[in-house]
Amino acid sequence: MLHDYSAEFVTEGRLEPNGYSLLLMTEPGSQHGLGVFMLSEFFRRAGWNVTLANPVDMNDFKRNFQSDWFDVVGLSLATDRHLIEIQQTLPELLAGSVNSALRVFLGGPMASLAPDTMTWPRTVLLKGNAIEAVEKVTQTLFNMERQISQTL
């Protein structure tokens, strides 16, 4: 049913592309992709170019992370199964990213259930609903762009 209405949702009220790109990923091996899919529709409706990924393991996670230029990577973490691995891998992935200003946002059930386990360097924790997530992520990039333009 969600798939049937997806195209209608995306086209209804859609804004022009905003030029921002987003990789939305679940944790490796996750069975909980519906929430990420639904969130992606909110970002698309706001004009974002969204890539969805559901990696099968940590190697796939790394490949997806570094597969293209992204302004933002959003990680939806449903369990604590890979928290330590992801936390340890992020600095390497950020250092090797094509975009040196890449922003990483953390969300999903773990952001609400155990936010204290997700306070990692160079990441922003998202709690709340999809509309709030889109607003916070978009505003963060807008503020970064404004700071850069003021220094030029």
Map each language-model feature to its residues.
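Peripheral docking tails and interdomain loops at the edges
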Residues: 105-152
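Cofactor-cradling patches in redox/metallo enzymes
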Residues: 58-117
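Short, well-ordered coil/turn elements that cap or connect secondary structure elements
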Residues: 45-47, 99-101, 120-121
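Short, solvent-exposed amphipathic alpha-helical segments in soluble enzyme
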Residues: 38-42, 89-93, 122
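A structural preference for short, hydrophobic beta-strand core positions in alpha/beta folds
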Residues: 52-53, 106
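Short helix-loop-beta junction
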Residues: 37-51
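Cofactor-binding loop segments of dinucleotide-utilizing enzymes, especially the Rossmann-like FAD-
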Residues: 27, 55, 109
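Long amphipathic N-terminal alpha/beta scaffold segment
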Residues: 1-36
